[in-house]
């Protein structure tokens, strides 16, 4: 009997399924998408009903050849990609490509929500057909994003600079961040006061707060004139200190708290950001590994959680039975909620998949600890705890509120104090969380104090109505209203979800794009828009009326949902979208200002709402008196004189402002050349350095390293060797492109020792005969093929000779982030991304003696640095040629 062929996306998933299905099935991986729109050109024929022109992705020819070979003689080909739009599209593309080569095979869709033996065997035993409505929704989204991405980005290139980009959802997310920052800048803090007190009864003290004055409730938000000044607050304090404190009422209420539902994708992303400090991308990468399966010793490979891309809170009946039995066994019958708790679905939820939950209640976190990485265990514990607590009894607290009158005999003034105490009577579902639940909100600006004292925490002594209490202290405490907080990843995801922008499965990519494009940066895990990001938003708002509004983007998502549900044809949805888009695009082409020749600063202020000039120089050049213009160059935005080249005045617009860097350790530094004081500066690229205050007469600079917001100088370091040309010591210098060795007699002696050829040990994936070497370009080290110029293949990140555990690509890239080193697969559709500690360490780069690779590199050949990656500070743009070596 011929084997059936099962195709999944990743090798890890394939290994797991192969163990479940046995010898009658051949399980292979397609490594994600096999076809897509070409990288160059729009490749959408509007005249033929938006017909897309797909092509096999580079590197997938060999994968498809292996799949065709594996399918020879197979009676059935099971397409078992993920159960969502992207997975459905992968299955459809596979069928379209493989069907001509396997005419006798029957193509069936195998779909499962969890990778367990029972779920997989059931899916293969009862396969279905490819859902063409899902495929249509994916095609519509892909085509819309291609039209917007190419045509709006092309507009930015023509008006501003080559390399800028915009996107249907990415630009809306960026706009949200920019508008929040503008709101913060316009915010004016308002001072106000409160009067916290400490009361006592029989030597037991407890906190209270003045909440009433002259019989009216006080407002603690800066709007109450009765507490607007310290003098007014001190008058209240004086009254309380001279008053008798009599208890007016004591009220005890019982409050029940029900647990939150099991995780949806967005809620998991938010909780992981708040509780674990994970980025959205990191959360999804770890969840993917938990879903695809982990080797659990004698148990074999098991998928630990259900599919992690879902907006549903629904749970399978058998899972509900299992979790309630687990609660009963661990905490007793009283801990189980009397009724099975079923959570209401949010409006617009697809409900195609279950909520994210453990696949087996027989695998608590303690049972799998030794098989998981640190990140995997943390996230699995979060999913486990959330699911278990969702079927537990409510927590019960008793809240006691004591209202107290402060009155002076013979006077009309009366102050009202309130003390609140909370006692947890039954932990209920909180037992599963140990300390605290994961529903702590990240947002909130801290405005307002509330009526209770110290938020009602703690126990109060026994107090009865009519009793007199003692006063320990009463003070006037100053406050200021706070601006709305910046968005972190969790709060931005929450905002996007609540407003229907994008889908949870796309949030990680959206946040990655706006950060990689250098449109935002992070400070204290919060997004701050860069000058470039502000400019892009202003240009989009100027050129497009409502195309990048949250409401329009949300309506577009609803239409894609209708396509998936089968109530709207995908071509009709595209036609409606494109009709408006073409009109908006042409209007923007005429309306949008151009920065190609520079834009006068006076016009910048009139035109742009969100763009801000740090260290604003005014409208005229301080050297020539001509107008100043905003311009865009290879290193980013800057200000220049309109009289150029007669006047060479320029001013940088740094991404990180000097006042955000702690330069306390650099105070008192003097110039080695002229003795003048040195001052912290930031260049156009955002890099910090010490510059001589005697500039331009003295141009001496010292590189500065900024880490954690703190700056430290990096002076030259002697190597212990002498210059062969002049005899002076050789030193390690710290240039803008990295460290290098040179003569300390520079500039009189320009000797620099030749660099050895350094290989990474990775074979070139393009020409397959060369080797990837370490090279140095104008933007720092990069990695290029030894066969340059015949083969131009290069990398910005360091490749290492280690196969990707997910897709099998024979190398991974090393990326350094604030959280440490990460290993990333660049294969499109793979998305593998893991911390260094999760993988074995790689061998260091091998140094090869000079001339060892002469034959491979070619005499005198110099490989150009790659174009700046999206992670660099500013786009390199058109015409960015590699710096030529002198001599």
Name each model-derived stretch.
Residues 267-279, 493-503:
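Short helix-coil junctions and helix-kink-helix linkers
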